[in-house]
């Protein structure tokens, strides 16, 4: 998920790394499961002409920031941050936000949300609809989990000894 988002962001902003792509190259759409952007130069921004995005993310993800985690302009910017940026820039997206769900959304949508993924491809990619949709989902039987993490906690989760 990070690779797909990062590639589209680099292409959208005309970064040097993206210049290996043909000049008229454009991703038809991006499906991101618990992904984020990595930036060493402050807050990343998409333009309104970025590819439409389907963003899945759980609010209790301690592996990849749901919103953002940064120190001195270096950080990861997750699905909530990306959706807010695309809203400001009139970019097309569908943001599936799952309350109290952790990093399991890095894989489960590919099995459990096939209908939603196919509908996104039909509506946003094939038919070219320019929509901004946010679905906030909560399993009322699921236990509440932490939803705020420090940079140190993200590092500890990802780099256990």
Language-model-detected regions and their locations in the chain:
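Alpha/beta-hydrolase-fold catalytic nucleophile elbow
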Residues: 31-34, 56-57, 99
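Extracytoplasmic/secreted cell-surface and envelope-processing proteins
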Residues: 38-42, 63-65, 105-107
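Acidic catalytic loop of the alpha/beta-hydrolase fold
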Residues: 60-65, 70-72, 103
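Gram-negative outer-membrane beta-barrel domains
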Residues: 62, 78-85, 89-94
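C-terminal catalytic histidine-bearing segment of alpha/beta-hydrolase fold enzymes
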Residues: 87-161
């Amino acid at each position: 998920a990070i690779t797909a988002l990062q590639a589209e962001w680099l292409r959208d902003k005309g970064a040097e790394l993206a210049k290996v792509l043909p000049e008229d190259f454009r991703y038809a759409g991006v499906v991101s499961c618990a992904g984020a952007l990595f930036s060493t130069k402050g807050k990343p921004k998409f333009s309104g002409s970025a590819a439409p995005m389907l963003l899945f993310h759980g609010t209790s993800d301690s592996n990849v920031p749901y919103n953002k985690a940064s120190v001195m302009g270096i950080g990861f910017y997750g699905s909530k941050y990306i959706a807010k940026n695309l809203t400001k820039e009139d970019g097309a997206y569908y943001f599936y936000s799952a309350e109290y769900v952790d990093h399991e959304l890095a894989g489960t949508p590919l099995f459990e949300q096939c209908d939603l993924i196919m509908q996104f491809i039909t509506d946003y990619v094939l038919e070219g609809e320019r929509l901004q949709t946010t679905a906030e989902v909560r399993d009322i039987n699921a236990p509440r989990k932490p939803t705020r993490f420090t940079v140190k906690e993200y590092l500890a989760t990802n780099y256990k000894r």
